From Swiss-Prot:
A Pfam family: V-set
Keywords: Adaptive immunity, Disulfide bond, Immunity, Immunoglobulin
InterPro entries cross-referenced by the UniProt entry: Ig-like_dom, Ig-like_dom_sf, Ig-like_fold, Ig_sub, Ig_V-set, IgHV
Protein name: Ig heavy chain V-III region E109
GO MF annotations in UniProt: antigen binding
Disulfide pattern: 22-98
Annotated PROSITE patterns: IG_LIKE (PS50835)
Length: 113
């Protein structure tokens, strides 16, 4: 059974920082690109960050709205992906999900700024 479990959300003041984590199981994590997406009433579903494989030197890509503020990383030995979020803004509020190329999804973690 594939599982993705996010954690680390909560309430933070504007300008603050927060780190989200996602632990995966049930598939070979190191073989999958990983993404963070978020959902809010205002913007709907919004892709925010992607990290590729070791063979791609863990290349990362970001939505313009978070570039320079958010950093995605992964630890294949722990089947985990992370999202460090700095200088948070009200518009970053939403449920944040980790996903493997949109095939598998976690339950999400709510970030409120």
């Amino acid at each position: 059974e594939v599982k993705l479990e996010e954690s680390g959300g909560g309430l933070v003041q504007p300008g603050g920082s927060m780190k989200l984590s996602c632990v995966a199981s049930g598939f070979t994590f190191s073989n999958y690109w990983m993404n963070w997406v978020r959902q809010s009433p205002e913007k709907g579903l919004e892709w925010i960050a992607e990290i590729r494989l070791k063979s791609h030197n863990y290349a990362t890509h970001y939505a313009e709205s978070v570039k320079g503020r958010f950093t995605i990383s992964r630890d294949d030995s722990k089947s985990s992906v992370f999202l460090q979020m700095n200088n948070l803004r009200a518009e970053d509020t939403g449920i944040h999900y980790c996903t493997t190329g949109f095939a598998y999804w976690g339950q999400g973690t709510l970030v409120t700024v």
